[in-house]
Swiss-Prot record:
This is L-asparaginase. GO terms for biological process: asparagine metabolic process. Keywords: ANK repeat, Hydrolase, Repeat. Pfam families: Ank_4, Asparaginase, Asparaginase_C. It comes from Dirofilaria immitis (Canine heartworm).
Length: 590
C-alpha cells in the first residue's frame, strides 16, 4: 500500500555538494549528481520508486522510511544548465531561482536549493526578500565535501534539508548546515575548512538536528500578509558596500558614493562609529544622502548591533544615515536592492522599510508578555508542578486547546491575548489541527482573517489530510472560501477523494456543496475511483436540473469512466433525449 507522501522540489544550482573528483580536483559535471543519488540507498529507496513511479515520465527520488514519521519524502530534482560556481552567482540567477519556485509553488510542500557555499548567504538573503508572503519551507544547503565521497557532509545536509522541507511548518527561507537550521537572512559563512561553515551570529538557530529534532517555533518568522505568494523579480543593481578603515582616502569614499549609486551599506567600527575628525568623509556622506542615496550603517563586528548613543554614530544618524541594527552586510545589501526596486514606494517609504523588520532580518525590541496566564499557574499548583521542564510540558499540553477553544468561538480578543502572552498561534492539537482549521470549521471569518495576518498556515494538513480550505468548504461558507483562496490556499485532498466528494454531492443533488467545492478550485470533471464524474452520477440519477447545472459549468459529457461509458452514452441508454441534444452541442473538454 502506498504511504502518505510529502513532495519536495530540489533545485540543484551547482556547488561542491554535487561535484565529481577528476584528475585530482573537484569539478562540476552535468547529470553526475542526478545519476549518483539514484544509487545511494541513504538518499533513494529505489524499490519504492520502482513500485509506485515506474510509469512516471520523470522518476523522482525517495528517502528511506524515517523514524517517527508516517510520510515518505518523495523529491524531484532540477539540475541547472550550466551548473554555477557560487562565486559566479548574479542577481539574475537569484531571479531565476525565484521564478522556478514560483512556477512549482503549488505542486510541492517545500523546496530545497543546492548551492555552493561561497555566496550561499547572499542568495539566502536575496531570496528571503524577493519571495513575498512565503508559507512553505524553502531550505538552502550545500557542502564542504561532495555527496558521493565516503566522508561527506553533503549527504547529511541534503537529508536534513529534505526532512525539514517535507515535514515542518517553517515558512521562510532558511539555511541548513551541519545539523543546524538558520534563518537565511541572518546567516554568514565563517569558515572555509570546517563542517561548521555557517553561523547566525545574532540569532540562535531555528532548529537543531540532534537525536531528536528540536524546533524553536517561537523564533519562526511568519508572513503577516493575507496576500498570496509572489516573487518580486526586480532588483536594483546600483547598490554597494563601503567599509571604513583607518586613514581611508577621500577619493575612495567619493568613488563609492557617486551616481548612479542609489544605496550603500556603510560598514563602520564597533557599534556604528567612524572617525569623528574626518569631516571630509562626513561631508561626502551628507551629499549622498541629500541627493537621495539611502545609506545603511552596519557594524564590521560579527556580533552586536549599531548603537546611536555614541557621538559619532549619532552624527551619522542625524544626517539621515539609517542605523542597520544587527543586520549582516549580506542582508543589508540585498534588502537595499529589494527595497530600492520598489517603484511604487516613495523615498520616505523606502527608508522606513529599511528600518522595519520585514523578514526577520533584524532585531527589534519586543514587548514583554503582559503577564503569565493565570490558568497556567493555577493548573501547576493543582498538579503540584514546580520545575521549569514540567511547566513547559504543561504549556505544550494546554495552549493548543486554549487556542482552538478561542478559534471555535471566534474570540479574536482571546486569540490576541494568548499571542501577547507568548503563545505560538501555529501550534496544533492532538488531531493535527491548528487554530485556522478550527476557525474555518466554525465559520468565523474574523478569526480566520486575524490568524492569516499572524502567519498561521493554511497549507497545514490535519490527520484526515484536510487543510483549512477543506474545512471552509464543509461549512459551505463562500466568504471564508474566498478569503482563504485570495491568500493562496489550495485544496489539500487527493484527486480521487475529491472526485468521490463531487460524485457524492451529485448523488444527493447538493448544488450548494458543489458550489463550495468549485469556489475552492475543484475541477468539475474530477473522477472518482470508478472514473465517474459528477455528471455521470447526475445523468444516471435522471436529475435533469443538476445535469444542466453541471453542463453550465463546463462538465464534460464525453468523459470516459472505467467501464468505457460517458455521461452522453448514459443519457442515450436512459432515453433522455433533451439532455442528449444539449450534450451533443458541447465540445469535448481537452
Amino acid at each position: 500500500m502506498q504511504c502518505e507522501e510529502a513532495h519536495v522540489l530540489v533545485l540543484y544550482t551547482g556547488g561542491t555538494i554535487g561535484m565529481k573528483y577528476i584528475d585530482g580536483v573537484y569539478q562540476p559535471e552535468a547529470n553526475y549528481l542526478l545519476h549518483a543519488i539514484r544509487d545511494l540507498s541513504l538518499l533513494n529507496d529505489d524499490d519504492y520508486v520502482s513500485t509506485y513511479y515506474s510509469d512516471a515520465e520523470i522518476r523522482p527520488y525517495c528517502l528511506p522510511p524515517l523514524q517517527h514519521s508516517k510520510k515518505r519524502v518523495v523529491y524531484w530534482m532540477i539540475e541547472y544548465d550550466p551548473l554555477l560556481d557560487s562565486s559566479d552567482m548574479t542577481f539574475d540567477d537569484w531571479i531565476h531561482i525565484g521564478k522556478d519556485i514560483q512556477r512549482a509553488y503549488d505542486q510541492y510542500v517545500g523546496f530545497v536549493i543546492l548551492h555552493g557555499t561561497d555566496t550561499l548567504a547572499y542568495t539566502a538573503c536575496a531570496l528571503s526578500f524577493m519571495l513575498e508572503n512565503v508559507r512553505k519551507p524553502i531550505v538552502i544547503t550545500g557542502a564542504q565535501i561532495p555527496v558521493c565521497e565516503v566522508r561527506s557532509d553533503g549527504r547529511e545536509n541534503l537529508i536534513g534539508a529534505l526532512i525539514i522541507a517535507a515535514n515542518y511548518d517553517i515558512p521562510e527561507v532558511t539555511v541548513y548546515f551541519n545539523n543546524k537550521l538558520f534563518r537565511g537572512n541572518r546567516t554568514v559563512k565563517i569558515d572555509n575548512r570546517s563542517m561548521d561553515a555557517f553561523e547566525s551570529p545574532n540569532m540562535l538557530p531555528i532548529a537543531y538536528m540532534d537525536v531528536d529534532i528540536k524546533v524553536n517555533y517561537d523564533s519562526i518568522f511568519r508572513s503577516p500578509s493575507m496576500a498570496p505568494f509572489v516573487v518580486h523579480d526586480q532588483l536594483c543593481r546600483n547598490v554597494g558596500l563601503l567599509r571604513i578603515f583607518p586613514s581611508m582616502s577621500i577619493e575612495n569614499v567619493r568613488a563609492s558614493l557617486q551616481a548612479p549609486i542609489e544605496g550603500v551599506v556603510l560598514q563602520t567600527f564597533g557599534a556604528g562609529n567612524m572617525p569623528s575628525h574626518r569631516t571630509d568623509i562626513i561631508d561626502e556622506l551628507k551629499k549622498a544622502v541629500d541627493r537621495g542615496c539611502i545609506i545603511i550603517n552596519c557594524s564590521q563586528c560579527v556580533r552586536g548591533q549599531v548603537d546611536i548613543h555614541y557621538l559619532t554614530g549619532k552624527v551619522l544618524y542625524d544626517m539621515g544615515i539609517i542605523p542597520g541594527s544587527d543586520m549582516t552586510a549580506e542582508a543589508a545589501l540585498t534588502k537595499l536592492s529589494y527595497v530600492l526596486s520598489k517603484d511604487c514606494w516613495e523615498l520616505v517609504e523606502k527608508k522606513a522599510m529599511m528600518v522595519k523588520n520585514i523578514r526577520g532580518e533584524l532585531t527589534v525590541a519586543k514587548a514583554e508578555p503582559l503577564k503569565d496566564l493565570e490558568i497556567v499557574s493555577q493548573m501547576a499548583r493543582f498538579l503540584h508542578l514546580s520545575s521549569s521542564h514540567e511547566m513547559k510540558l504543561l504549556c505544550h499540553a494546554i495552549f493548543p486547546q486554549l487556542l482552538c477553544y478561542a478559534a471555535s468561538n471566534g474570540d479574536i480578543e482571546m486569540l490576541k491575548a494568548l499571542h501577547e502572552n507568548g503563545v505560538d498561534l501555529s501550534v496544533v492539537d492532538y488531531n493535527g489541527r491548528n487554530a485556522l482549521h478550527v476557525a474555518a470549521s466554525a465559520g468565523h471569518v474574523g478569526a480566520v482573517k486575524y490568524l492569516l495576518t499572524q502567519g498561521v498556515s493554511f497549507h497545514l494538513r490535519d490527520q484526515w489530510d484536510e487543510n483549512a480550505l477543506v474545512s471552509a468548504v464543509k461549512m459551505k461558507n463562500k466568504i471564508l472560501i474566498e478569503t482563504l483562496r485570495s491568500a493562496g490556499a489550495l485544496l489539500s485532498i487527493n484527486s480521487r477523494r475529491l472526485g468521490v466528494e463531487l460524485c457524492l454531492c451529485a448523488s444527493y443533488g447538493d448544488t450548494e456543496t458543489l458550489n463550495s467545492w468549485l469556489a475552492a478550485g475543484a475541477d468539475i470533471n474530477q473522477q472518482d475511483y470508478n472514473g465517474e464524474t459528477a455528471l455521470h452520477i447526475a445523468v444516471k440519477s435522471r436529475n435533469k436540473q443538476l445535469v444542466h447545472y453541471l453542463l453550465d459549468r463546463d462538465a464534460d459529457p464525453y468523459k470516459i469512466d472505467d467501464f468505457n461509458l460517458t455521461p452522453l452514452r448514459h443519457a442515450k441508454k436512459l432515453n433522455l433525449q433533451d439532455l442528449v441534444i444539449r450534450m451533443k452541442k458541447m465540445k469535448k473538454v481537452q
